[in-house]
Amino acid sequence: MKAIILNEAGSVSNLKYVDIPKPEINDDEVLIKVSALSINPVDYKTRSSEERINRLFGDERPVILGWDLSGTIVGLGKNVSQFKLNDEVFGMINYRGNGKAYAEYVAAPASHLALKPENISHQEAAAGTLAFLTAWQALVTNGKIKEGDKVLIHGASGGVGHYATQIAKHFKAYVIGTSSEKNKEFVLQNGADLHIDYAKADFENEVSDIDLVLNPISDEINNRSINVVKPGGKIIYILGEIAPEYVEKAKNKNIDLFAVFVKSSGPDINTAADLMQKGIIKSHVSQIFSFDEMKKAHLQLETGRTVGKIVIAL
């Protein structure tokens, strides 16, 4: 099968196309013939950092990146009862760990998958995996979002942000989304009640009394967001470590500032399937690249200007 491997961290030129045997599956896995996969900022950040590769893959080299996929089951482990051959499934597999999704065939834990709704494409399904799960686990699992909450979503036109906006509206929250001016209509179409152009206005001067903030941008945004959150509110950061002084500053104002790291979840990906099947959540796929264009897809994502999601079609 075709696969893309990485021997060491570096630029996109380090992504190498190879022919390797199809993976063997264990008793709790299925073999998936991949129709589409999705890439996220973690893909290029891992590709370019030996430290990140070590954190996710240990000493294994070469590695195969990728966690988000949609495709058809062509092999079943003996313990798998929830799926059958030829079922179309999707999911974020083995995150944070060794997903190996940059390949024509992938061995995936059955517990990380859901049946793909018949009314959405493989591309839409693959898009709605890591980014959807990140938004869901941040806002719902950890943020405890509820009807009437005033929610501020930074980067509302991005992969995580555009799902977060839709999720927040599903919970009947009042949603404020930040993005560039050119993506204003997209953010509002996703359900935001108010849009803030971050280039023209400091959000601190535009909003106050926020219950819940989702921050997929930077730690400095955490610091600035403290100024607009009401006592008892939450700021959720999805990019990693938070400066201790920001956590202390938030604590002094009775604000809970913390990081959330997405993880593979069968129940959550089945929630995604249900919401997509009902049309409540929609994936916005802004660009589709072929498997042979993976390097170009990484470069596009690295611009930081992608609206919605980038998908690779096989």
Which sequence ranges carry the predicted segments?
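Terminal helix/beta-alpha structural elements that buttress the NAD(P)+-binding lobe
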Residues: 1-26, 33-70, 75-76, 81-314
